[in-house]
């Protein structure tokens, strides 16, 4: 679906350079100034929610990281979400794509609020596709989180559990509406160089000839560390997320919100099965961290929505991102 969006954009602007519309600073970040061709998106996995969003992600090999184009004009004209199209997914693909849903919902739920987001250009055409957490996106993000926690383990465990498969496709779409409006932040920003700098990892259940870290895996592997870091910005939201995992938060102190949510996430990932327990399990070592940081810092489209991050690409932000990768080595 993302490839179709990119082709729609490039065929509508045949004289444009590859990087003209790609998110700055990796590209020029130019706005899309006219309607694109009609596009019907049909998901065959329960993960990206791309049928609902104005985002198209691709691997920019020269930068050793993923990036993309984000603009409302990229949103498909129509999305056809039929659970029958997901029935042939292997368990490993159910798991990896479902973890993308999990992080879409968690990141959009915890993103910087819409009224605190910067920059906020006065010209509407220059405004980013992602607006920050808001009352509308919250509805979709929280429901997608609850559904993923309930149905993803079932969909992975039993290929004949059609109810779970159907609910996961719905959750992916709901999360797409949520994060397509509010945005994602650190898990996704850090995942792009993780995927692009794969040291040789082959994921269980994927019959690939070349090393591959599935996108959902690259996103979820840092999640326990990420939400421990972001929790002080809004402990109440992080505790509400922990409650979705079944945690009794009635006596949890606000300052413990990150630890509680991080532990709930780690427990969920372990019980899901066949998930790498940190970057070390993917083959990364401490000597790789500097390059991972270099691949993360240009991801301004999402980092600008990260609560608690010293936004701006300076030394403090670099130290924070470095520490996050260090903390994500194992959980």
Task: Go through the PLM ranges and name each one.
Residues 71-73, 94, 140-143, 233, ...:
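A generic short alpha-helical patch detector that favors 3-5-residue windows
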Residues 114-264:
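Active-site segments that bind and position negatively charged phosphate/pyrophosphate groups
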Residues 11-129, 233, 240:
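A glycine/threonine-rich phosphate-anchoring loop and its flanking beta-alpha core
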Residues 240-331:
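C-terminal charged capping/lid subdomain of soluble metabolic enzymes
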Residues 12, 16, 62-63, 74, ...:
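Generic secondary-structure signature for well-ordered alpha-helical cores
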Residues 7, 28, 288-289:
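N-terminal loops that bind phosphate or other acidic moieties
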């Amino acid at each position: 679906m993302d490839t179709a969006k990119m082709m729609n954009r490039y065929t509508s602007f045949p004289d444009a350079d590859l990087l003209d519309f790609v998110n700055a600073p990796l590209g020029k970040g130019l706005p899309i100034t006219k309607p694109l061709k009609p596009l019907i998106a049909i998901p065959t996995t329960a993960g990206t929610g791309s049928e609902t969003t104005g985002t198209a992600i691709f691997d920019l090999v020269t930068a050793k990281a993923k990036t993309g184009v984000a603009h409302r004009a990229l949103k498909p004209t129509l999305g056809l979400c039929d659970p029958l199209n997901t029935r042939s997914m292997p368990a490993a693909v159910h798991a990896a794509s479902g973890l993308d849903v999990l992080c879409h919902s968690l990141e959009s739920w915890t993103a910087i609020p819409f009224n605190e987001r910067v920059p906020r250009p006065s010209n509407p055409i220059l405004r980013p596709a992602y607006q920050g957490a808001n009352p509308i996106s919250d509805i979709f993000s929280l429901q997608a989180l609850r559904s993923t926690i309930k149905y993803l383990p079932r969909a992975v465990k039993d290929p004949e559990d059609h109810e779970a498969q159907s609910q996961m496709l719905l959750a992916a779409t709901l999360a797409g509406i949520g994060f397509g409006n509010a945005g994602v932040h650190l898990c996704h920003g850090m995942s792009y160089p993780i995927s692009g700098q794969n040291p040789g990892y082959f994921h269980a259940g994927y019959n690939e000839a070349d090393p591959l870290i599935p996108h959902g895996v690259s996103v979820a592997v840092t999640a326990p560390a990420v939400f421990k870091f972001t929790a002080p910005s809004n402990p109440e939201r992080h505790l509400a997320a922990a409650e979705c995992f079944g945690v009794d938060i009635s006596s949890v102190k606000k300052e413990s919100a990150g630890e509680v949510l991080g532990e709930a996430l780690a427990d969920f990932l372990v019980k899901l099965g066949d998930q790498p327990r940190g970057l070390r399990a993917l083959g990364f070592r401490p000597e790789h961290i500097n390059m991972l940081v270099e691949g993360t810092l240009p991801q301004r489209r999402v980092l600008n929505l990260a609560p608690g991050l010293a936004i701006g690409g300076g030394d403090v932000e670099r130290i924070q991102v470095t520490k996050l990768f260090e903390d994500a080595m194992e959980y």
